[in-house]
Amino acid sequence: LKVKILRKENDTPGDYGANGRPARAYKTKAKLYLALGASLDENVYAPYMLTSPYTNSGLANTASYFMEQNGLTLYEARTNTTQENGVLYDSYAESDDGKVLEYELYPQLRETGGRATYAGVYGDEFKNVDYKDAYGMYGLYFSYASAMNSQSVTYYNENADAIAKILVKSIVRYFEI
């Protein structure tokens, strides 16, 4: 398992352009783009994962399964019955008139999936036009806690090492490394 961290300390690259995180990942020929973040939803009390609705939820489902098997809690939500607990599809963007578009909201998923997720063809994302025909990476957004829920932050702080170890185990198992 090779891991490449796409930013340096005090470096905050965005999701667009030649120096953005997706561009850095494409240049390294990454197979997986793992984005970590925190939710701002005060109702979220435990970690959850987002995947692209244009791809499968296989890795996230594997992580959910192993976390449950190891006594870890995920936010009890899922997009559909083919997904495990704590696994959601990203939402679609809407136009100014409320029409649902074919583009996802999270650039960490949309801009890393290449042509499968419409990378480089929406709004500011034209800065990633070089990747609109790329095969892309498997994108996974792992929301480790809610910044608006102290119970969620406490749970993460108490279980961060176990969550990280199970996430790595899931990646190794899913990709058969």
Question: Model regions: which residues?
Answer:
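Active-site-proximal helix/loop segments of hydrolytic enzymes
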Residues: L1-I177
